[in-house]
Structures are given as C-alpha cells and as structure tokens.
Amino acid sequence: MADLKTNLLGFTMNSPIIGASGTVGYGVEYEELADFSKIGGISGKGLTLHGQYGNKGERLWETPSGLINSIGLQNPGVQHFIDVELGEMLELKQKYGTVAIANLGGHSEEEYVEGAAMLSESGVDIVELNISCPNVKVGGMAYGVKAEAAGEVVRMLSLIHI
C-alpha cells in the first residue's frame, strides 16, 4: 500500500484523511468501526466557549439523497471538552497517531479568543475555526459571510500560539 503520510501545520499525519467535525463525534464512538491507523486526524464536534443546547424542534430530516440537519452547535462547551472528550481524542492519538483537532465556533470575537486561548493550553493539536456554520443564528453566520469579519477573527486568533 502507498505511504499516504502527510504534514499539516507541522504534524505528521498517517494520511490526508480527517474525520470531519460533526460526523465522527470525538472519534472514540467509531474506534471499533474504522481502522484509525489510516486516518490522519479527527476534528471533534463543534464547540463554543459556553455549552449550548442547540436548536429546538426537528433537527434532522431524511431525504432520498441523505440528511439535512439543523443541530445548532449543541455542545458541552470548551472547558467540558478539555476535561472529558479531549482525553479520549488524545488516547486515540497515542494509539493510532491521529491528530486531535478542536472545532471552535463563537458568537463574538471575544468568545473566539477566550475559547482558543483555553484550547491552546489544553494539549489539542490544532484549532479549526468554525466561522460558517449556518445553524448559528447569532454571530457565527456573519463571520463566514463577510470576508472582513472572517479576517478579523483569524487576525485576532493568529496572535495566540496554538
């Protein structure tokens, strides 16, 4: 088999395949179903500084070609992720070499900065910015729609060593 090792931001990955945020939980849920030695990284479920319940009502709609979802970034918050789920992701990294990626959303620049600062000291390998999730009704949508707003969040977070 071909060697698919690749480098992402200084991290050697088993392959360029990354379990996308929101599709594989925090990885451990799929450990028995996938050969993690062939997966480069896991991008955990989307996080916000403070936990959120997500959207009310119908959140999944099945269609003949797949699913439509409107989850609304339901998550336990950054601190809970650091205390609980990150340890599970880092165990996968130790066993299989999968890079641990945190997916961070926010409702303000300050929330992004505070969440990223906490994650930068947590042991997570990479922080992926969630600036375009269409499920967020306050703040998040605007960052992904306007280049200036997205650029400002990226600029502010580039000052934090992650």
Pin down the residues of each PLM region:
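Active-site-adjacent beta->alpha loops and helix N-cap segments on the catalytic face
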Residues: 82, 135-156
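Non-membrane alpha-helical structural segments and their capping/turn regions in soluble enzymes
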Residues: 75-79, 109, 113, 144-151
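Non-cysteine beta-strand/loop elements that form the S-adenosyl-L-methionine
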Residues: 43-50, 124-133
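Short beta-strands and strand-loop turn motifs
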Residues: 97-103, 129-135
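N-terminal capping/small domains of soluble enzymes
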Residues: 1-100, 106-107
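Conserved small/polar residues in nucleotide/adenosyl-binding loops
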Residues: 160-162
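Catalytic cores of alpha/beta
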Residues: 30, 112-118
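Structural recognition of alpha->loop->beta junctions
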Residues: 38, 118-127
